[in-house]
Amino acid sequence: MLHVENFTMTHQQDLKVLIPSLSFDLKPGDKLALIGEEGCGKSSLLNWLRQPDQPLPYVEVTGTCSNAFGRTVWIGQTFPAQDEGLTIEAYCFDPVLAEQIDYGYFYQLVSQLGFDPDRLTSQQLMGTLSGGEKLKLQLARTLALEPDCLLLDEPSNDLDLATLDWLSRTLANLPAAVLFISHDEAFLSQVANRILHIETIHNHKASRVQLVNLDYETYRSQRQAQFQRQGQLARKQQEEQAKQEARHRQMHDKVQHQLRQAHDSSLGRLLAKKMRNVKSVGRRLERQAEDMLEIPIQEDAILVKLPCPHPLPASKWLVNEPDYVVRLEGRSLTQPLTLEWRGQEKIGLVGPNGVGKSTLLKQVRDWLTDRPGLRLGYMPQDYRQVLPQDQTPLDFLQESGSQEEKT
């Protein structure tokens, strides 16, 4: 069992508490999904569980973690950089792991994952594989260790649909404990039997954590019903509060007017006492307003608008390549293809991992780079290829770098 006690995570820069006072147990058979918005601390929590004694960048943590599982393994969001230069053979038959891996089971997993077992002795570098192929080998090697506990950071990324379905069924049926991060609702629904939700409240000024022993679909439906009930009750409270405050203002204005008109000292004393009572009611209403339910705010969906002041003509050829073969390091990945793409067409590249989708996308990028009259945007699978690692997000988004732009 893995036990966490009073875990709190605080951002070093603005001292915002990302995760407040979290305690939970992870037991064999648990499939605990860690969900929440980007940047709420999910990956940092997973990293801390992996190495509680190691400091984390950008955050301060307090709390304790005791892990009684015999073997805990971790798969991160990105393939380890130190393994990119290994050959497939060196990665799969690492002598450090040789005595720990059941290679009969490993070959079985590789086949189930749709990776050709004949390629396991290849001298091809891991860094030249597609993201999905790397993850398949990583999953096979990890599962062949037969761990008692799995820590997985978005394991459904990069996988083709068939492999994603296989992974969902495999994880759901594992006797091991699994704690995983995911934004994929279908994957969450198939795997999770517990939910740990880190959410921001009060317009992102605070955080709270909910731990429930429910599958994802049940949690989502109950949460939505709770949102509706709380919203109805909060609006009813606000309406009643507004009525009480309106009556209070009327009473306050009436007594204040009477005080100004009073010339008799006895009447003045009575009205002054009445005004004190009115002000007491006002203070009570203020305290009541502080204790009212908030109208719940759902996490905002991401809305991306791509401005295009001068759309491409629908008839304009972007790509027109007959008999094109996708190749990688001299190896043909496809049969000859006829590639045709005109302006305003939206084309999706689909297919199993390793068939050449990313390679083809890079080739299309190369064809269109510096094309006159065309503004090209490119988003690779690994953003480290295009994002400067030595800049902050603010520095990257600035155009001029001036102080005026920063403020």
Where are these regions (language model features)?
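Coupling and communication elements adjacent to P-loop NTPase active sites across diverse families
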Residues: 1-11, 101-124, 221-331
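Conserved beta-strand
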Residues: 4-7, 14-27, 63, 321-325, ...
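ABC ATPase nucleotide-binding domain signature region
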Residues: 30-37, 43-101, 199-203, 343-346, ...
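Conserved ABC ATPase signature
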Residues: 125-129, 133
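Hydrophobic anchor residue at the start of the ABC signature
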Residues: 139
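Catalytic Walker B motif of ABC-type/P-loop ATPase nucleotide-binding domains
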Residues: 150-154, 379
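H-loop/switch region of ABC-family ATPase nucleotide-binding domains
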Residues: 182-183, 380
